[in-house]
Amino acid sequence: MFSFFYRFNWNFIKWNLVDNTVSLTQHKIYLASKKSDIFLVKNKQRRFFKSFYAHIFSVRNCFEKFPSLQSYFYSSKDKFFLVSLLSSKRNLFLHGFFYNIKKAFLFYSYDFFLLYKLSFSLLLTSTLLPYINDINPCFIKDYYFFVEGNFFDFEQILIDVFKYSYYFKVENFKFLYFARFSWIYKNFPLDVNFLKNFLDRKNLVFFKSLFLIIFNFIFNGLNFFFQENFFISYKVYYLFYIDKFYFFFKFPYDFFICKKIIISFFSLRGIILNININSFYRFETFVFNFFIFDFLRFGSNILLHINKKHIQFYKLSLKMIVKMFLKKSVFFLVNLLNKKILDCLNRGFFCFNNNFLFLELDLYLYRLLWRYIKKLHSRKTRTWIYSKYWKFFSGIWRFFITDIKTGNFLFLKSHLYSSKYFYSYRNMKFKISNTLNIFNLYNKGKLERMIFEKFKYKFSPNFIVLYNNQRGLCFFCKKSIYSNRFVILNIKKWNFSFFENLILIHFYCNNFNQLQ
């Protein structure tokens, strides 16, 4: 068998012929599924699953869709060897060699088990995907093993789901333990012996791609079942995570209809639900827990409550970037931190206390940078470090660095003031004050007073004379004037000079009763 592979070169294959053959076969399977001819679909899919075109198509896509698998590292012999093992006679997964596969291929210099697993996943995908109409993005993690050429964004799922006002959930929903496997054996278009080896509870192997395909196969046709039997016009949305099943609907009187639909639909699939569903929840009053997040709808916005573990994990990642950074290039470090901050903000986190949360993250990041810069310039004073790395820009103290080699300058991005964070799903933007101080919030008054002392000479000469005569204090409240919101009053005492008739007060102290 190995001598046969030496005669061929992987690069000389006519891939146009392979792509056209695979596309034509998938289109025939799709047309047969529209006619509801199950036996014809199973016959075509079994032939396509055993064909040489499907095997070589899956191995090629394995290298293209996973860039970490460098194609030049594998020879043509290795790739054709994978193609031969995907055949029905030599397929390791079809014959149940789940536990001995790693031991059998330990002598290979590359991770053969991972490569074979990905190729087999894509083979199942290309074979079964044309038959499944309702592709439900229930499994967010590792879903790319199943859906070929499609990526379901988690934010887009939330946008669609949160259009609905109510939901109910079914817990401890393990369909592999509730299902009667006879329905799956009869309708699932794969070898029966292979399914028996996989679905056997004694030898159950959690092979993710096949698990997802069986799941979507069981739920296939749920939307059509709704619209045909119960005359519901809107689309059905449901999510499935581990052992929890969530179902979403618009109106409260649809709850009993949806409950009846689910029980009758699953009974046709051989799944008997013995769980009582007696209550439903509203998004505005009950938190929707999915994955490790808690969601709540507030008006037109989706609010996300970020738990403490999430914040601690993100802080730890920032700390590891700063602490494990071995180079002395602060410019490169700030660039890495900016990418990390953008990656965090692009997730679209929404919570009630977003200002306090992101202010806390900014302060934590500035403390990390202060310790790093202090170690980098151990002989320099604090004043020198502040003047070199922190600049007052647009009313905010920001970390600033200049690259000496290229002359480029870079500001450290902020969690709180980043424009990419303040958005909603309806493009509603939020505005915040530019006078807030992030770096030293407790000395905000001293900072404003210092800035005022620096720029007070740019005002009119009359103001400077009054300011110096009153020693920078208001005439009434005797508090400092370090704001541009002040008033100059003429008390009209003709016995005095011109400047003695004028007083400088705060705008809120402008009470003429106090002049009497």
Curated annotation (Swiss-Prot):
GO cellular component, one term: chloroplast
Protein name: Ribosomal operon-associated A protein
Main location: plastid
Matching InterPro entries: RVT_N
Note: The protein migrates at 80 kDa in SDS-PAGE gels.
Keyword Plastid: yes
Subcellular location: Plastid, Chloroplast
Protein species of origin: Euglena gracilis
Recorded coiled-coil stretches: none
Sequence similarity: Belongs to the roaA family.
Keywords: Chloroplast, Plastid
Superkingdom of the organism of origin: Eukaryota
Pfam families, alphabetized: RVT_N
Gene name for this UniProt entry: roaA
